[in-house]
Amino acid sequence: METRAAENTAIFMCKCCNLFSPNQSELLSHVSEKHMEEGVNVDEIIIPLRPLSTPEPPNSSKTGDEFLVMKRKRGRPKGSTKKSSTEEELAENIVSPTEDSPLAPEEGNSLPPSSLECSKCCRKFSNTRQLRKHICIIVLNLGEEEGEAGNESDLELEKKCKEDDREKASKRPRSQKTEKVQKISGKEARQLSGAKKPIISVVLTAHEAIPGATKIVPVEAGPPETGATNSETTSADLVPRRGYQEYAIQQTPYEQPMKSSRLGPTQLKIFTCEYCNKVFKFKHSLQAHLRIHTNEKPYKCPQCSYASAIKANLNVHLRKHTGEKFACDYCSFTCLSKGHLKVHIERVHKKIKQHCRFCKKKYSDVKNLIKHIRDAHDPQDKKVKEALDELCLMTREGKRQLLYDCHICERKFKNELDRDRHMLVHGDKWPFACELCGHGATKYQALELHVRKHPFVYVCAVCRKKFVSSIRLRTHIKEVHGAAQEALVFTSSINQSFCLLEPGGDIQQEALGDQLQLVEEEFALQGVNALKEEACPGDTQLEEGRKEPEAPGEMPAPAVHLASPQAESTALPPCELETTVVSSSDLHSQEVVSDDFLLKNDTSSAEAHAAPEKPPDMQHRSSVQTQGEVITLLLSKAQSAGSDQESHGAQSPLGEGQNMAVLSAGDPDPSRCLRSNPAEASDLLPPVAGGGDTITHQPDSCKAAPEHRSGITAFMKVLNSLQKKQMNTSLCERIRKVYGDLECEYCGKLFWYQVHFDMHVRTHTREHLYYCSQCHYSSITKNCLKRHVIQKHSNILLKCPTDGCDYSTPDKYKLQAHLKVHTALDKRSYSCPVCEKSFSEDRLIKSHIKTNHPEVSMSTISEVLGRRVQLKGLIGKRAMKCPYCDFYFMKNGSDLQRHIWAHEGVKPFKCSLCEYATRSKSNLKAHMNRHSTEKTHLCDMCGKKFKSKGTLKSHKLLHTADGKQFKCTVCDYTAAQKPQLLRHMEQHVSFKPFRCAHCHYSCNISGSLKRHYNRKHPNEEYANVGTGELAAEVLIQQGGLKCPVCSFVYGTKWEFNRHLKNKHGLKVVEIDGDPKWETATEAPEEPSTQYLHITEAEEDVQGTQAAVAALQDLRYTSESGDRLDPTAVNILQQIIELGAETHDATALASVVAMAPGTVTVVKQVTEEEPSSNHTVMIQETVQQASVELAEQHHLVVSSDDVEGIETVTVYTQGGEASEFIVYVQEAMQPVEEQAVEQPAQEL
């Protein structure tokens, strides 16, 4: 041993435990303590490790990473022993150790870590053995040359398999590693002499060997020609690189709209590596590949210093510490990877070989065969090239550059499975289609997950068709069943609709508890009655079925029979029960399918639905499954017809309890028992023509039950498996009160605010309003665009605040998820209650249960996570009830807080300059503008400045074409907003009930007077010294408008109409000359106008008398005989003759009932020349107005000679002289004690 130590020994190693030491005495003491009991010689355990010797000592520039890969001698080689010139040159230039001193197995450990790095791709290795087997260093494996790999050891097979699964590292240019001197062949020197040329584009070419496939071919940039180009490239290199390039392949849009509301992706993204120009279809594969170039190894072993760039490799490594291995069933081979075991069985035991088509050689894997064909055969040959293309598709590298095409729409897909699923889109029917929204799925599991997203199923009470939202249900009723009885049909349909959410789901038990309790009690009562009548004999049951139910909630159960003998003996899942109301004459010609939803229990369908055959006389009796939990009630066609014929005329045929239901006898929750209630629809259907008997008919679906049940759609299978709650109108109103009344037509989701609703609808319509200015990205919301710009086009990185953690990301949500790793709370593990699989994060187990175990309830998930979990977003955002009243507000919203402050009398936002206080921060900000003289908002069109942004926005409307759309009918004033016009109309009013006590200011509303006090008399107390309430006669004379319901007084008809609509919900409608008050169900901006035409009589006097009588009827219409205010009601304006003589009636025109604020065109009836001065005066005025005045101008003509008429106002409307507008103002009799002369006023 001393002799061995004398020969330039640098380090000693313990062979048993791989312990190294430069001192031999330390190892001797170690062996004596640890390994003496093993009975081995010390010289055999301690071995010296000598440094590598070099044949060229003067050359000091050689580094330790240049090794000779020793060829393994396994006997006489087969075939030619001729070696390629490249291999000979490389072997000559690689330093070889002395032949008399063979390398020890672990001698690479004596080298520094920097020497265990590949000089070509800069990849580092932990020992010399791995470096020798690296693909950049190895010259040629003798086993591959021989074409046989069956004699290799298992360890070598594992390493080779590992190399097959790992992507090959790219070759770095020599210019990046100038400190290393390498002696390589001239061919490889030319390959590595320059950097990789950047990819400038990607070309898609049709694959020659595979039809329907496209190959991605990257196009590299050409060599630089001028110095300017070089300078540009150099400046571009200074910009930090992402490491990859992203390319978007535009997808061909669909020619026809898809059945689903969601559109397919418009782009297909692929990626290329900037270091080695490899093409990747998936970004996660690219990110794992980039870690090879960046030497990033984020996955570290907690028990040793091992680190890897791929998480799967770390999982394999951890099995070294846990001892978990995969064992071969045929031999004693064990390995850490399941894939390695599979390769071992194929190579060693199954003897699977890859044969060359052009020679007799065989290879153990496809990669070696491809290498052989490229080296030994001509790749330019057509047959060789086709064989290479076919073999490349069997490798991961070959599939990486392949896309799959749809031959119909030319859309492209990244894998063949997606393409095959897409082909179903072009078929007549989707294999897994949602019947509510038209969404199509290619897998049953995907359809099942999709249907669970629909909170409600709305069912038409007439045709039993299902809809996803009440909007589509209402539209369907209008278009198909007519709008005559729309309200009744819609109400009945709501009562037969269902909620698909289970208890504890998205519906609040607190908010909807009362309604849900009523529904559950109703179902419980129905279930008890059904079970009682089910146990009765068939004859008694038929007799009882003819009786009227004693209570509204009681629904007698019908007789039950089995549809067919095949259904009796075959176990089948529950099917759709169908009910149609038709006439007996159309019994065989009209069949409308309708579906009842049945609750599918967890019990076996064979036990629940299968029954032994019964004789015909026993089929009318019910089949009660005493041991099962599900009782299915089926109504036969013959019995339903017979029962209806016997009871016809006594009661409604559908109101006799002939309902179909599925009752769960063992279910403690009676609300889960569902029923169909067509009784409510019986009154909604029109009577049958011809007096035929109306019966309940069951179509052929139940007559041929086995065929129908076997052909049940996937959607109905999913729907039958879900728990349901039947809805009613009160529950529906309660839900909308909690979640909002804005309903999405496409998915049925509810919203409170219009802005949120509009944003959500764009997710269905795919309307992108926000576009990125730096790329082709577009988004639905502004926040998504902002997030995109931060992540993609900015260098902002958010770093983890934890000490010692270098994690950084541009996405704040990813940072929040990362921070959970450092918290002790989230380090707990969660176990799945079904498969007992463990997860480290709560989001992972929730996603796992949702995907694999959708039947698990929310309460079970809440128990697993230790906190309450709810399904969010299915219906919408919940509202919270005010603790002081019954109003609902958005949860955690500012409206709720302000509302509570209003109850408590709190105004937290106070002005620091005065005593003003408010509950809104925005109101305080607007108030502070009064104390400031600075105007910071500038109009860019006229230069005018304003204090607030809202005022500037209103001002800019004046510069638009249709900005001033509110026009005064008295003068030429126009306003951009309606409140401004209402404020302007105050100056045209003679009676103003609000008056200032300190000046002559008066107004029509209290708000204007308060504003006047704040601006003109800020130190005075508000006081109204107006006349207040006056008598009806005084109000009529002064032109004021007094509400006939309450005591409020208004000076304008606009304020009066708004008061009626807001306070009393009323509007005035003239019907046949009789003014009536009606409830204002709809309040449009402009009241409707009704027309009353008085035809000219044979004698002119009769026509004049009829017109005057119609006017007088309006003045005295109340039963008490009191005169009504002519402007308080909707006055019937008439154009009557202005003279008492008979010839004055020749100018009689249409009589029009005009609502306040409307514009009506009256066409002149006659053009005869009247002799009355008054008539001539009006006609001349009309002619003058039509010629000289423009649109919306008017003239006021007054005459003191006409009794009962004070003023006539003529408006022009267009260029034709025969079209004008006339307002007639009656002359008011002056009050005796108060003779005030009133000016002409327009109504």
Curated annotation (Swiss-Prot):
Residues reported in the UniProt entry to bind Zn(2+) 1: C273, C276, H289, H293
Tissues expressed in: Isoform 1 is strongly expressed in placenta, spleen, kidney, testis and peripheral blood leukocytes. Expressed in CD4+ and CD8+ T-cells, CD19+ B-cells and CB14+ monocytes. Isoform 3 is strongly expressed in placenta, ovary, tonsil, CD19+ B-cells and CD14+ monocytes.
Basic residues biased stretches: 70-81
Annotated stretches, region: Disordered: 51-116, 147-189, 534-570, 603-625, 638-705
Keyword check for Cell membrane: no
Listed Basic and acidic residues bias regions: 156-189, 610-620
One GO cellular component, as annotated: cytosol
Protein name, entry field: Zinc finger protein ZFAT
Gene that this sequence comes from: ZFAT
